[in-house]
Design a protein with these regions (language model features):
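C-terminal catalytic lobe of FAD-dependent flavoproteins
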Residues: 305-396
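Helix-loop-beta segment of a Rossmann-like dinucleotide-binding subdomain
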Residues: 71-97, 139-184, 280-282, 337-345
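Short amphipathic C-terminal alpha-helix that caps PH/PH-like domains
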Residues: 106-120, 291-302, 355-362
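Active-site substrate-recognition segment that forms the wall
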Residues: 1-2, 29-31, 67, 217-339, ...
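Glycine-rich FAD pyrophosphate-binding loop
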Residues: 4-26
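Dinucleotide-binding Rossmann-like beta1-alpha1 core, especially the glycine-rich loop
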Residues: 29-147
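Helical element adjacent to the flavin cofactor pocket in flavoenzyme catalytic cores
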Residues: 157-217, 221-222, 352-361
Length: 396
């Protein structure tokens, strides 16, 4: 979309019958605001990337009428409406404390996480970009200390807070982007797999199953399939997920967080008694069934009527550096071939930074911030439904 808004001629090649039919179809539609990554030990790198992406969302996507997120002096505001990109479905964080207080590093991590989330909640988005947030500064010392002693003296199994994370209507968002792109001249070619890429003079040739395409520049956005066309090595993580029903209407979306990651679970509510449950990522497929059993059993302890409609394993593709187990950020890599780039998107929320950053890399300037948009319902046929939406539609 960001290329077409600038008047460039763009062709989108998709090997499947519909767009967005893999990762964004499978996962929770969880919009990260940095809350979850207050627990990640990476010098706040992921947290800053996430917050920077929200800055870019506000700066480069506010022309879309259904982009219903706005800045305020104290946090981000969501204007709830039926066609809005985002929902006031805020996600509760439940930090496990029972039998964990002897793990003082966990107690500190929780104390720090809660203080940072409160900082995100109170951030003045009107006057300061959030992506420039510094590491833990003196203003956080006292809140962290207070949280630390509060945790030590509580008898609760979990310490619960409402995070700043919320959910998205990903299909509405993607259809708006696609509709505007098509209005600006985008050509979409589905069921047409990329086979090989090469340079010829100043041109790039994309050899596809339905014929060759010739252009000036090429972005390869094929997830784990990028290994076929580049020297990049991808680490795949497996996420057991289930679509469930009989979720009481008063149930809030939540994630249970623990020092021992294997016990983490979550649920994202989808309305009309539907929800999605999951929690962790695995390295080995053989471990998935054991975790399915565990997370379903844990959810049924509080909701015995919970019914599992479908189980599946989502795949996450990441570029991992030495010493890392996970890497959540996006990567834009210049290939040896002239005018060819490969892109690994990272978290869905980071899409709003990938696009403007890619444009800056290619054209050495920022994309425009104000432009005409388009909303056409008939783009529904080009964008695949989510797994949970498909299950819901089948059941009526």
């Amino acid at each position: 979309e960001i290329l077409t808004r600038e008047g460039h001629s763009v062709v989108l090649v998709e090997k499947n019958k519909k767009l967005a039919s893999v990762a964004t179809r499978e996962f929770h539609e969880w919009v990260h605001t940095g809350s979850l990554y207050t627990l990640v030990k990476d010098q706040m790198k992921t947290l800053k990337y996430i917050l920077g992406s929200l800055d870019d969302l506000l700066e480069f996507y506010s022309s879309f009428k259904n982009m219903n997120l706005s800045p305020s002096e104290k946090g981000l505001q969501i204007d709830q409406n039926k066609n809005g990109w985002f929902n006031k479905n805020y996600i509760d964080f439940k930090y496990r404390l029972k039998n964990r207080k002897f793990l003082l590093n966990w107690v500190y991590s929780v104390s720090r996480s809660i203080a940072l989330i409160e900082g995100i909640r109170k951030h003045d988005w009107l006057r300061r970009r959030a992506g420039i947030i510094e590491s833990v500064t003196s203003e956080y010392y006292l809140p962290i200390l207070k949280n630390f002693f509060k945790i030590l003296f509580t008898n609760e199994k979990f310490l619960k807070i409402e995070s700043t994370d919320f959910t998205t209507n990903s299909r509405l968002l993607l259809r708006d982007l696609l509709s505007t792109s098509i209005k600006n001249g985008l050509e979409v070619l589905t069921e047409n797999e990329l086979v090989k890429v090469e340079n010829k003079g100043n041109e790039v040739i994309a050899h596809c199953k339905k014929g060759d395409l010739i252009g000036k520049k090429l972005a390869i956005c094929v997830g784990g399939g990028v290994e076929k066309f580049t020297s990049i090595k991808i680490k795949k993580s497996l996420a057991p997920i289930a679509v469930v029903k009989n979720v009481p209407p008063e149930t809030k979306s939540f994630v249970e967080l623990d020092y021992f990651k294997k016990t983490c679970i979550n649920i994202i509510t989808k309305g009309s008694s539907y929800g999605m449950i999951g929690g962790i990522s695995l390295s080995e497929r053989k471990d998935a069934e054991k975790y399915f059993d565990y997370m379903i059993e844990e959810h049924k302890k509080s909701n015995p009527k919970l019914e599992v409609l479908e189980k599946y394993i989502g795949v996450k593709n990441e570029i991992i550096s030495r010493g890392e187990n996970r890497n959540y950020i996006f990567h834009i890599n210049k290939e040896e071939n002239k005018n060819i780039w490969s892109i690994i998107p990272g978290k869905f929320t980071l899409a709003f930074s990938i696009a403007p950053e890619f444009y800056r890399i290619i054209y050495n300037k920022n994309p425009r911030k104000f432009f005409d948009t388009n909303h056409e319902e008939n783009q529904e046929s080009l964008v695949d439904e989510t797994v949970w939406g498909e299950v819901q539609n089948k059941l009526g």
